[in-house]
Design a protein with these regions (language model features):
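N-terminal subdomain of nucleotide-sugar transferases
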Residues: 1-12, 185
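A short helix/loop element that forms part of the nucleotide-sugar donor recognition site in Leloir-type
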Residues: 145-158
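Short His-centered aromatic/hydrophobic patch
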Residues: 50-55, 74
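Nucleotide-activated donor-binding/catalytic signature segment of Leloir-type glycosyltransferases, i.e.
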Residues: 162, 194-197, 206-224
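Nucleotide-sugar donor phosphate/pyrophosphate-binding loop at the beta->alpha transition
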Residues: 69-71, 79-101, 118
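Carbohydrate-associated surface elements
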Residues: 8, 115, 138
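Conserved donor-binding/catalytic core segment of Leloir-type glycosyltransferases
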Residues: 159-175, 181-185, 194
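A short, charged, and often flexible helix/loop element on the N-terminal side
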Residues: 7-43, 86-87
C-alpha cells in the first residue's frame, strides 16, 4: 500500500496540506508548516519517500520520528538554482539547508538521470556514492501516448503546414525561456513560435517574459 501526502489543493488519492501557516510568513517557512503537518499525518508505514526540498523536511522528520528509512529523489538541486533567492529571499537559505540536511540524512538518494547523480555527488561531497542510485522518470503509456488528432492544435491557431518551435513549461530562469523569446526574433518568418508557458516564479520574471513576448509579437507574425 502507498499513502500519498502532498501540498496544495485537495486531490483524489492524496492527503493535501495547505502552505498557509504561519500566515504571512516567508514562503519557505509556510512550506515548512506544511511539512510539519505532513510528518504528523503519515500513518504507520515501512518507508518514507520525499521529492524535492518542498517535501524533504517532512520525509526527514517522519523518518526520525518513526525510526524508518527515508529515501529522497533528486529532480533538481538548490545549489544549482541561486536565482530562487529572487522568489524566496532569505527562504532560499532555508530551502538549501533543508535539501542538504535531508540528503545527508537519507538512507538512499534517487537521481532521475546519470547527470543528476553526478551533480548530486558534486554538490554534496560527503554523500556515500553507493547510496546514490539512478532511476529514470517513468511515464504511464496508457495515459500519455501520441494523439493523431489535430483539433486542439488547429484550435490554438497553429498552421500544421508550417514549422514550429514549441516551449512547454513553467516560467522560471532555470528553463531559459527569455533566451528563446529573444532568439526567436532571428527565426525565419514562416516559423511559428508556440509558447505554452505559465506559473511564473515571480512577478518580475512574469513581466520580463511578458514584455519580451509583446516585443516579439510586434515585430513578426506566427507567435502564439
Amino acid at each position: 500500500d502507498v499513502d500519498v501526502q502532498c501540498m496544495g489543493e485537495p486531490r483524489e488519492g492524496a492527503t493535501a496540506h495547505a502552505e498557509n501557516y504561519p500566515e504571512g510568513a516567508n514562503a519557505a517557512l509556510r512550506v515548512f508548516g506544511a511539512d510539519l503537518s505532513m510528518a504528523a499525518a503519515i500513518p504507520k508505514v515501512d518507508l518514507v519517500h520525499s521529492h524535492t526540498w518542498y517535501a524533504n523536511l517532512a520525509g526527514h522528520l517522519a523518518g526520525l520520528l518513526n525510526d524508518i528509512p527515508h529515501v529522497v529523489t533528486a529532480h533538481s538541486l538548490e545549489p544549482h538554482r541561486p536565482w530562487k533567492a529572487e522568489q524566496l529571499g532569505g527562504g532560499y537559505r532555508l530551502s538549501s539547508w533543508t535539501e542538504k540536511t535531508a540528503f545527508q540524512g537519507a538512507d538512499a538518494v534517487i537521481a532521475v538521470s546519470a547527470g543528476m547523480r553526478k551533480d548530486t555527488l558534486d554538490s554534496y561531497t560527503n554523500l556515500d556514492p553507493d547510496k546514490v542510485h539512478v532511476v529514470k522518470n517513468g511515464i504511464d503509456t496508457e495515459e500519455f501516448k501520441p494523439d493523431p488528432g489535430t483539433d486542439v492544435v488547429t484550435g490554438l491557431g497553429i498552421d500544421l503546414d508550417k514549422p514550429s518551435v514549441v516551449f512547454v513549461g513553467r516560467i522560471t530562469r532555470q528553463k531559459g525561456l527569455i533566451h528563446l523569446v529573444r532568439a526567436a526574433e532571428k527565426f525565419d518568418s514562416e516559423t511559428q513560435v508556440v509558447l505554452l508557458a505559465g506559473a511564473p516564479d515571480t512577478p518580475e520574471i512574469a513581466k520580463q517574459i511578458g514584455d519580451a513576448f509583446a516585443h516579439l509579437q510586434s515585430g513578426r507574425g506566427n507567435v502564439l
